[in-house]
């Protein structure tokens, strides 16, 4: 009866409000179980329909033998149960494979995980993308915690643990992000081994209102799918010995260090399936589909994921390929329009042939789906495949050195020397050639603007609404095809080689045959509003895609917004268009290899095609098929509006940092001078050069330039005079010296000891890098570094303040604003020539010299860099953006020897009078680089000093060379980087710097915090992908006190020590000085933050929860509002009760007898 009263209704409303204030708690019961997993349950290659016995490479992975495990492995996996009895498992979609269940939550929710470990060894559960306290981090590392805050790090066999993860607003998808962000959870005792053992699953964090409150499923899309692309390295699994014993027919014959055995255990999988064996995700035409994609793994886990048949939008941009790396998480959104069975593949050559393929099925669930309407222009192309004799160096000499390409001892001689068992620089190749009509009797003569295309096929262009009719004549001697990215085509024009129940004559065009492909450009493949006017794609032959593209069959394709193209096909508002393909043409994979050996080697029968040096000589590091500056046609005028269309192709070593010397490019609202390219990825960038001269464009991945992947572009004044001296404002002067030091990568060795102590079953991966033995140098090396001095006397080194302690090996952090000029007084105090040059800024010798002048030992030289507007942040950039400065005397050796530093350019008004930023509380610059000491100038010195041996007689074994590859952050390994300390509720900017070789793929993960990074808009992440030649500012609001792990998520890099900690101090504890409290096993920089079991006196409790100052304010506001509502409810209830009593008294008076006696 009470609840029917008005006061009761108000109380119900009050309780409802309490329910709104409290978050939805999403509870999961997860069990870790051991099981046997079959990577190919259908027992055949589903893509081709063939038996594995017909594929030599497939048998390597899948066939059992005396020393081969085969396709079935014991693994540990996460499983979802109904309740705490763990007796009833909740089934999951079959396409999810061995991944754990999909966990979902909205911003404001709380995720509670009850984890039960049914496995035979300890494991844990660590999330990305959500908030957690120390007792729910689920990650084992020396962080100075103990007791309850350490119990979460590992759950022993037969035990359980409860993790609590609030999904706070700070982890919410940014406005420009998809409605649900893709994250993962995984075991984190030894993360690489745990993940390879199978313990990983998806976690989706959604904006408020996206999930159904009762079912927990999404309401904003029709379908959602999750796919993990990774090379599952079963050699790293905790169960390797079990698998050898169980599945090898002669376990005693197994050599676990054998390279072929190890390769046989590397499974190139989608959710744990190979060769199309993944159960097909199914959807209907017209449905909205969200694809949640992520990568995991090692240095070779570079994945270019291609969705055949349909395009999608990711981070506001149209594409049909996305790149994934270890711990890269992406959400792509697709409106499905093309019915049929379509492939999902990794287009990295090695991964494609090793089985990283799947399929998805699109049905006509509502009857026959009409083709998307197109009413634009019909554009016709007549393209032939022809066999050609190609010269990678047609001018015969290196444009950068002036020496002949076959000069003995030169870098180029490896590729251009013809000999008994060497082909040299000329090869038979295949090439797409354009003809004028369908008779294919007369080639279309290329214009001057197309002279740079080289081996590339003709540029195909179309606007939205157009129809492309491409008549293909195979005038070569192999079966070929044309398969395009980025356009719409039905099965009649499908050139993909998969068996899907359709006759596809365009997939196999034999020599002498022709076929006409019909491609359309409907609105569904149009560039988005965020995209440039023209999207860059490529087309290629897909009969045997690795052989065909290695032979040369590739060309550029542009999809443009309506009204973008002139009548002659050129782009409106663009004066020059250039198309550059960066790839290592691996002639060893070309279908013409045997013919090239026969024609060009002097003794063909002596050639061993497996010989490492022979194989190396055929890997041609080219731009459009040209090497060492031999590409013609890269010329333009000053002030020209230039569009660069950049394309990648190849294998897992084809990670290219394309660098434009002397100018910057405009890329999605940002200013850069370099960008990263990967196989089958293409990018459009813009440039407006402001100085005439000659400049380099090259791949800054360290070995690639020395191997020939560099060209020269020329800018002529064309009547536009260079300003004699631009009106630059403040002159910022720095006194910098190059000097030699004895450097210790790991002065404190406790990190690895402590990790092994915490995990008694763990391995010591750091010994080879830190131990000084008879044949290992250890952690100390002679190096050369940049150091700042107080004045031009170069006597007193300028002391670094505490906020720069983290720079360590790096040179000083140089700041400048747009409009400034930087004057470097440089003294070479080292023993060999060096220089100092910078990316992003304008050198005083800009365009006059290809190479920066060097400074000899003992000399002093002056270098001047100007900061024009194009060198500062772009419209979408943060207030300050990073570049690097370095020595160019010998870029590769100088870098590995230690010469590198950060240069920060800012918008006007950002720097204070001391040259420091006034808009943030802290800034940190981090260089992630595998310092290859084998390439250092000082290797011989280090052998002499630390091994006491003669370098001429010392044998360089594989182990010795591996021991000299220091996986460092600012020159420190295994938790030795100090100075990453900040206070709670502070705004921090981190400048992430990528330099190095093909192994320098770095995915930087911040535990406990997320951050925003900007391209055209801001996006939320907790891992950032970093590559050679790329630099990025990330914005991190530090609001979670504690000492947290910061590391590269690449498996080998974790084991090699590329990890450290950063500390967020509570506001009440910011009086604690740097480097004062050291947890056991950590480096001297670690700071212990008071445990939440002993909170500070200024904290506030709300329903038993310890809150920090900002949270306390919010809690007080909520308490005030609730108190006010309770007061109102109480008053209303009291008034209602009082009114009820009066009515009751009145009724009693009415029913009593009147006092008639008184009458």
Curated annotation (Swiss-Prot):
Binding residue positions for Cu cation 4: 303, 346, 351
GO molecular function terms attached to this record: copper ion binding; ferroxidase activity
Glycosylation sites: 160, 235, 406, 588, 771, 934
Signal sequence extent: 1-23
Enzyme class: oxidoreductase
A Pfam family it matches: Cu-oxidase_3
Key words of the record: Copper, Copper transport, Disulfide bond, Glycoprotein, Ion transport, Membrane, Metal-binding, Oxidoreductase, Repeat, Signal, Transmembrane, Transmembrane helix, Transport
Cofactor(s) for this UniProt protein: Cu cation
Enzyme Commission no: 1.16.3.1
Residues bound to Cu cation 6: 1002, 1048, 1053, 1058
Reaction(s) catalysed (UniProt annotation): 4 Fe(2+) + O2 + 4 H(+) = 4 Fe(3+) + 2 H2O
Principal cellular location given in the protein's record: membrane
Disulphide-bonded residues: 180-206, 284-365, 534-560, 637-718, 880-906
Localization in the cell: Membrane
GO biological process: copper ion transport; intracellular iron ion homeostasis; multicellular organismal-level iron ion homeostasis
InterPro entries: Cu-oxidase-like_N, Cu-oxidase_C, Cu-oxidase_fam, Cu_oxidase_CS, Cu_oxidase_Cu_BS, Cupredoxin
PANTHER family (UniProt xref): FERROXIDASE HEPHL1 (PTHR11709:SF233), MULTI-COPPER OXIDASE (PTHR11709)
Linked pathology: Defects in HEPHL1 are the cause of the curly whiskers phenotype (cw). Curly whiskers mice carry a recessive mutation that alters splicing and causes omission of exon 11 from the mature transcript. The cw phenotype is characterized by kinky, brittle vibrissae.
Protein name: Ferroxidase HEPHL1
Organism: Mus musculus
